[in-house]
């Protein structure tokens, strides 16, 4: 799915062996247990890129509660560009995707399907990097 495409794109940008992937549970209690189990890993790496701002913000909260300072000890970035990303402390660096364009594109695709027109099954939308305090050292 989309998350796998993001991970593969990230890997291709950094090269083989430079990116470790952590599959994170959706349930918060299970996610927090995974974070606790992996705390040594968080102390070893220099940065984390989460597949969504939600997971990045959740991780930053966990890190702070466990004595790991963002960004001094670990840089954190997310994906979505949600309004919350600019309100947390430190403000989250994020890859923003225009949600209006995403909705417009989805509606166009649905109309094409309703009208039995051929349509692409995969659409790649432009993104913008919004650099904030969570990745500044």
Placement of each model-derived feature along the sequence:
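A short glycine-/small-residue-rich loop at the edge of a beta-strand within enzyme catalytic domains
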Residues: 1, 22, 26, 47-50
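Conserved donor sugar-nucleotide recognition element shared by glycan-biosynthetic enzymes
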Residues: 2-6, 31, 99
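Secondary-structure junction motif
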Residues: 1-12, 49, 56-57
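Flexible loop/turn connectors
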Residues: 18-19, 33-137
